[in-house]
Regions:
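Conserved acidic, metal-coordinating active-site core of Asp-based
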Residues: 119, 127, 133-207, 213-221, ...
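Short amphipathic alpha-helices and their capping/turn segments at secondary-structure boundaries
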Residues: 4-20, 73-80
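Hydrophobic "anchor" residues on beta-strands that sit immediately upstream
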Residues: 23-25, 85, 207
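Asp-based phosphoryl-transfer active-site loop
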Residues: 17-37, 65, 192
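Mg2+-dependent phosphoryl-transfer enzymes with acidic/Ser/Thr/Gly-rich catalytic loops
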Residues: 2-6, 19, 45, 189-266
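Active-site phosphate-binding/coordination module
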Residues: 43-134
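Conserved Rossmann-like nucleotide-cofactor binding loop
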Residues: 31, 71, 214
Length: 266
């Protein structure tokens, strides 16, 4: 059972001060920024961006922003922060700090996914508020502002569409969104492992903060690390729980202060 982050901050700071290097992973929507009815309207607020810049200037902290958004979209909303790694499409795309990766199975199936997404655009036109977002390697079907009585029908339409190619694609559910993703062993946990291996030799303490079902793969990958579920902690593998993005920002400020005192002590 996860513990409230605010109650555990003392023990967390003790671990941070004794760690050699830190690898910080942050989900975007619902973690760094609040969820909203229109994903295209969401931006990282200046205060949080400035905090990320302060953290990224610390040579002993490697920061990754990881999201289900397409990597270009993620980069545009976070903005350029020197030293940050950007991981889009749930880690299927990665770049930053000299790293570059595109998951090959997802890349090979992009054209077929594009055709499937175009078909869904037509099929979902009757449902008010539902829209399809093709993200290159994955596709999201958003229904945050769709009347509740239509949600089940939307799910049926999407599942029937995927059923035409079940060996290549699978469906994942999030907060008021369904995602069509390629069948591959790659997920956010695999992305975390890939990034950490490229940060060099030596012991690394990972911190992962996320709010989505897809973040559970990362929590599973990091059983001995500092893992934080944002929002409802029911069923999570994370050690700690934070109520909202404001609490995440407060934690990041504490992390910055902790790193400053740690650096002063070395």
């Amino acid at each position: 059972m996860s513990r409230p982050l605010a109650q555990a901050i003392g023990e967390i700071e003790k671990r941070l001060r004794s760690a050699g290097r830190l690898s910080l992973f942050l989900d975007f929507d619902g973690t760094l920024v609040p969820l909203g009815p229109d994903p295209s309207a969401i931006r990282l607020d200046p205060a949080t961006r400035e905090t990320l810049k302060r953290i990224s200037r610390k040579g002993s902290i490697a920061t990754t922003v990881i999201s289900g958004r397409a990597i270009d979209d993620l980069y545009m909303r976070v903005g350029h922060v020197e030293g940050i790694v950007y991981a889009g499409n749930h880690g299927l795309q990665i770049f930053g700090r000299g790293m570059y990766f595109v998951e090959p199975t997802a890349a090979a199936r992009s054209s077929e996914l594009c055709r499937m997404s175009s078909a869904l655009v037509e099929k979902l036109k009757p449902f008010m508020g539902a829209f399809v977002e093709f993200k290159g390697l994955t596709t999201a079907i958003h229904f945050r502002i769709t009347p509740e009585e239509n949600v089940q029908q939307i799910g049926t339409v999407v599942r029937d569409t995927i059923a035409t190619n079940p060996e290549c694609f699978q469906l994942k559910s999030g907060s008021k969104v369904l995602e069509i993703v390629p069948r591959t062993n790659w997920n956010k946990g695999a992305a975390v492992r890939w990034i950490n291996r490229r940060l060099g030799d030596g012991e690394i303490l990972s911190i992962y903060i996320g709010d989505d079902n897809t973040d559970e793969d990362a929590f599973r990958e990091l059983p001995d690390s500092i893992t934080v579920k944002v929002g409802d902690p029911a069923g999570t593998l994370a050690r700690y729980q934070a109520p909202d993005p404001d609490a995440v920002h407060d934690f990041l400020l504490r992390l910055t202060d902790c790193e400053l005192s740690r650096s002063a002590g070395h």
